[in-house]
Amino acid sequence: MKVYAVLRGFPGLGRVIAGFELLKHLENKFNAIVKVSTYLQGDSYINTKGYTSSIEIDEKDISSVGVISVSKSGEKLMEDIVSFNPDIVIIDGEPIFLQNLKISYPNLYIVSLLNPFDVNNPYNQKSSQDFFSYMYSFADLSIVHGLWEEQKPNNFKDYLSVNSIIRDSIPTISFSEKSNSIVCLLGGGSKTVNSGFTYGTIEIAKQVIDIASFNENFDFTIYTSDKDIKNKIINYLKYKELSVENIRIIDSISDEREIYTNARLVIARAGRNTISELLTMNMPSIIIPTTANFRGSEQLCNCRKIESFNFQNIKTHHLDSGAEDLNHKMHKLFNTSVDIKNEVFIPGNLKAIEKILAIMKKKSPGNSIALSTNIN
């Protein structure tokens, strides 16, 4: 089995992590021969896992919705896929490239990984939603994964809607309820987004800095994966003339075990993947949406879903409630039992892999892949 993955490397890492996990799983458990192409933060992420992008994508060939398929980089990417002759092409977040690839090479089997908002986004303008939906419909199989399920659009082909696909390592991570370490996750980045999204991300950091200043017995680590955001946070500290010795700011992509293992509590931007990881670990957490057009609206929907789960260990916070309220919620979570297990949210990895393997078996009836193989 040969699998090629094309993963959009912005605005954060959500588009990269899921596809990359499926790719690694197929490689490690089923001896698939794999290739991956990504860019921006995506390239940095797979480098930390020992992989390199097969094609280097020129930044000028990237649009707000992914690789420009008729650019030099887009053409090189198509040629690389075709020469590899994969059984399956996994594409996440590249509607224009996906459509062009299927038009030019209709016999390629394309699996599209989608966010529920890719399928149904009431906050997006109708013309944009119709445009993206039409492009995504060219995929042979659409796997929609997130915090809720979405109904299959009429124009889509084979379809699966599941909970978020997360990193395989996440269920094995144990956090420390007795540590003094507080982690702030500002997402995988803020590339090609509007100023409101970046502003909201920085505002989360500001409130964390404020509560750090009067919680000196705790160490706060802010992970951003974005040097521009780190610089803005440092400028805020200078402007406020704050010398907060219990704060570290990390602007590089860090291993998930390093981030979570010693944390007592996580304060995080309300992205789909981060929330899904926290739910899976049952990590005491506070989820904060940014304040920005449709991306902010998506994060608000994520928060509403969290509230509907009514988990004692995971709470939401809104920036206009202020740092004092954030501090109150943090200390309240310190007194919440971590023994309460999450039996509501089960990651979608298993169902997604089963679906892909079933397709492979159907495409090649003589294939030796056994669906009964342990794929956990």
How does the language model describe each region?
Residues 4-11, 25-79, 237, 244-246:
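Conserved nucleotide-sugar phosphate-binding/catalytic loop shared by glycosyltransferases and other
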Residues 7-20, 190-199:
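A short, glycine/small-residue-rich beta-strand->loop->alpha-helix junction that serves as a flexible
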Residues 90-93, 255-298:
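A donor-sugar binding/catalytic signature common to diverse glycosyltransferases
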Residues 120-192, 223-225:
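A nucleotide-sugar donor-handling region in carbohydrate enzymes
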Residues 332-376:
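C-terminal amphipathic helix plus adjacent low-complexity
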